Amino acid sequence: MLMACYSAGQLGCLVFCNEAEYSYGKCIGRGRCCCYDL
């Protein structure tokens, strides 16, 4: 499984991760997202 964490800014995590072509995303607080590719 690939994982990358980003500062997503105003985008929601799911939108941000989907646009980055990951399978799904999870917020980890303070506007940061971890995106996962299953």
UniProtKB/Swiss-Prot annotation:
Keyword Nuclease (UniProt): no
Paired cysteines (S-S): C5-C27, C13-C33, C17-C34
Record flagged with keyword Disulfide bond: yes
Keywords: Antimicrobial, Disulfide bond, Fungicide, Plant defense
Superkingdom as given in the UniProt entry: Eukaryota
A GO biological process held by the record: killing of cells of another organism
UniProt record similarity statement: Belongs to the DEFL family.
Protein name: Putative defensin-like protein 105
Organism: Arabidopsis thaliana (Mouse-ear cress)
